[in-house]
């Protein structure tokens, strides 16, 4: 399966194919001339796949160096970025060389940020290994790292030269790591794809069902994001729809402590909680919050978080990139398969969170 991201300046393809990881070297060679490659990964994914990917790349004539960092959201910061810069400098990486991001969303976000800023930008590709990364973060060119005060507050827009997705690697994920990716999948069904929502409604929510339908789930999710990114690369309009559930979700991730609530879990919480607010304001139809919550629960996703620290959540919301003065742009779902943007006063948001 192939999806074309037909951007005017940086078009690229998304390849979705079971077993594709075996041919990663040939795929990269179809994009780049043989050169030096920095393979950026974390200690967990690296232990599973780094050597195989390195050998595949070397077989095609690439010189490969591997940068490993400690897995998890807590590593997605400027300290790790600086270590990566020093590694690239030490290994003589130039602007004609490239980066291969091998891992989940943390690896992809960090490696993309490093690639887009090292020497003012070098080429990179994404090889996502988690469901969250395969359906969401590897596509669209958003890169970024966290600070103690806010998630993804430091970042760039930088498109990869390609994305290679092998659904087979999902079989090595733990149950929680697989299920959290369904938070983003549910989001795609809600904002733009009622057929995807229907598929999710029809399957039983088990790990087996997710893996059995993984190619279709990944393809439909990627296609939603592809369409939106092509229409609005730099988030001037409809790309905001992709943030459904993320406003409160990011606040939950931050206040809980990075890594304690996984990203897809936080998105699920955020979707349910913002829908609850929107229902109370009559911006969404009555009963839709219950539908969203039931879908999330079916896949084992959380819909609430304890302890619910309103003051800390409110402070996090004020630091959100979507905050404008005394209000914040939020995404709502007036009906399944359709999204809209609404401006909610921050004080009002706080009042709803307290109830």
From Swiss-Prot:
It comes from Streptococcus thermophilus (strain ATCC BAA-491 / LMD-9). NCBIfam families: aroB (TIGR01357). One of its GO terms (cellular component) is cytoplasm. The gene is aroB. It is found in: Cytoplasm. This is 3-dehydroquinate synthase. Belongs to the sugar phosphate cyclases superfamily. Dehydroquinate synthase family. Its cofactor is Co(2+); Zn(2+); NAD(+). Its EC number is 4.2.3.4. Zn(2+) binds at residues 184, 246, 263. Pathway: Metabolic intermediate biosynthesis; chorismate biosynthesis; chorismate from D-erythrose 4-phosphate and phosphoenolpyruvate: step 2/7. SUPFAM superfamilies: Dehydroquinate synthase-like (SSF56796). HAMAP family: DHQ_synthase. One of its GO terms (molecular function) is 3-dehydroquinate synthase activity.
């Amino acid at each position: 399966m192939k999806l074309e991201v037909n951007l005017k300046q940086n078009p690229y393809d998304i390849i979705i194919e079971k077993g594709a990881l075996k041919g990663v070297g040939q795929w990269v060679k179809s994009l780049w001339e043989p050169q030096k490659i920095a393979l950026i990964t974390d200690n967990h994914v690296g232990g599973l796949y780094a050597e195989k990917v390195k050998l595949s790349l070397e077989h095609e004539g690439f010189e490969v160096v591997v940068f490993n960092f400690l897995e998890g959201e807590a590593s997605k910061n400027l300290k790790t970025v600086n270590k990566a810069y020093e590694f690239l400098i030490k290994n003589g990486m130039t602007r004609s060389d490239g980066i291969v991001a091998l891992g989940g969303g943390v690896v992809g976000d960090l490696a993309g940020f490093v690639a887009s800023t090292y020497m003012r930008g070098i080429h990179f590709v994404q090889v996502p290994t988690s469901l969250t990364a395969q359906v969401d973060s590897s596509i669209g060119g958003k890169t970024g790292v966290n600070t103690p005060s806010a998630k993804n507050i430091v970042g760039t827009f930088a498109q990869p030269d390609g994305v290679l997705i092998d659904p087979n690697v999902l079989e090595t994920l733990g149950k929680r790591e697989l299920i959290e990716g369904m938070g983003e999948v549910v989001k795609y069904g809600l904002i733009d794809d009622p057929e995807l929502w229907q598929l999710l409604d029809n399957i039983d929510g088990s790990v087996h069902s997710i893996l059995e339908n993984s190619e279709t789930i990944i393809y439909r999710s990627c296609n939603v994001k592809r369409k939106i990114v092509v229409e609005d690369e730099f988030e001037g309009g409809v790309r905001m729809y992709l943030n459904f559930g993320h406003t409160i979700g990011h606040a939950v991730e931050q206040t809980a402590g990075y890594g304690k609530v996984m990203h897809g879990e936080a998105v699920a919480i955020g979707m349910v909680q913002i829908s609850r607010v929107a229902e109370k304001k009559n911006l969404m139809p009555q009963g839709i919050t219950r539908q969203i919550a039931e879908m999330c629960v079916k896949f084992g996703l959380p819909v609430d978080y304890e302890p619910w620290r309103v003051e800390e959540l409110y402070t996090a919301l004020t630091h959100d990139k979507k905050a404008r003065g005394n209000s914040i742009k939020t995404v709502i779902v007036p009906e399944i398969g359709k999204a809209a943007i609404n401006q909610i006063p921050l004080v009002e948001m706080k009042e709803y969170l307290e109830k």
